[in-house]
C-alpha cells in the first residue's frame, strides 16, 4: 500500500483524516524499539547491517510516491539518487555512501567507551552529513545516537521540540566548519534536561500527619 492508498482506506474505515505517515511513524517506533532491545543488552556494535535494519524499521510505509515509485527508493536501502540537504548541500554521492558509512562505523567503534558522548556526537553529525538514505536520516541518526550511548553505558537523550533550533544550529556548525563542540555541548545539556524531566512528578507524596487523623469531625 502507498501512503495515499492507506490514507483513503483509514478514512473510510474509521474516519481518520490526519497524517497516515504519522500513524506509520508511531508504529515504526515500536517496531524499532523491539528490534533494538536485545541488541542493546548484548551491546552489539554498530554495523552497516544494523543501520539498514534500523532504517527499514523506522521508514517502512513512509516513503512518498516520488521516492518510492519514480526513484525506486526502498526502506533499508541506501539512496539511489542525490538528496542534498541544508544550505550547505551536504550528503555523500550515492556511490560513496557505503564506504563513507563503513569508515564512520570503524572510527566510532574504535573509540568504544573512552569518550561516549563525543563519539556519539561525531557519529550523529557525520551520519547526517553523509545522509545515506533517501528519507528518514534524522530519525535514524537520533536512534543510532541513543543506541550508541546506551551500549556504552551512557544515558539516552531526547531532543525537545523547543530546542530544535539549537540542535540544527549545532549540526550546521559541523557541516560548515567541522566544529563538533556545539553539538557536544548541546547533547550534554539535553542529557541533563532529559533526566530532570523524567524524574519530575516521581517524588513521593508526603504522608498524612497525625494531626489530620485526630481532628474533630
Protein language model regions, located:
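FIC/Doc superfamily catalytic core
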Residues: 1-135, 139-217
Amino acid at each position: 500500500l502507498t501512503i495515499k492508498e492507506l490514507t483513503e482506506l483509514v478514512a473510510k474505515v474509521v474516519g481518520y483524516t490526519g497524517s497516515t505517515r504519522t500513524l506509520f511513524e508511531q508504529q515504526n517506533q515500536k517496531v524499532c524499539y523491539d528490534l533494538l532491545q536485545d541488541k542493546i543488552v548484548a551491546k552489539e556494535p554498530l554495523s552497516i547491517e544494523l543501520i539498514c535494519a534500523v532504517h527499514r524499521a523506522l521508514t517502512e510505509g513512509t516513503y512518498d510516491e516520488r521516492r518510492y515509485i519514480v526513484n525506486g527508493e526502498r526502506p533499508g536501502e541506501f539512496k539511489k539518487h542525490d538528496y542534498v540537504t541544508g544550505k550547505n548541500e551536504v550528503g555523500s554521492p550515492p556511490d560513496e555512501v557505503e564506504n563513507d558509512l563503513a569508515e564512520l562505523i570503524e572510527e566510532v567503534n574504535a573509540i568504544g567507551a573512552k569518550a561516549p558522548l563525543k563519539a556519539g556526537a561525531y557519529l550523529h553529525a557525520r551520519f547526517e552529513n553523509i545522509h545515506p538514505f533517501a528519507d528518514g536520516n534524522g530519525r535514524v541518526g537520533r536512534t543510532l545516537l541513543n543506541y550508541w550511548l546506551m551500549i556504552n553505558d551512557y544515558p539516552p537523550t531526547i531532543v525537545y521540540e523547543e530546542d530544535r533550533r539549537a540542535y540544527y544550529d549545532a549540526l550546521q556548525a559541523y557541516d560548515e566548519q567541522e566544529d563538533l563542540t556545539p553539538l557536544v555541548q548541546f547533547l550534554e545539556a539535553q542529557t541533563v534536561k532529559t533526566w530532570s524531566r523524567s524524574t519530575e512528578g516521581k517524588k513521593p507524596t508526603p504522608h498524612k500527619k497525625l494531626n489530620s487523623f485526630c481532628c474533630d469531625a
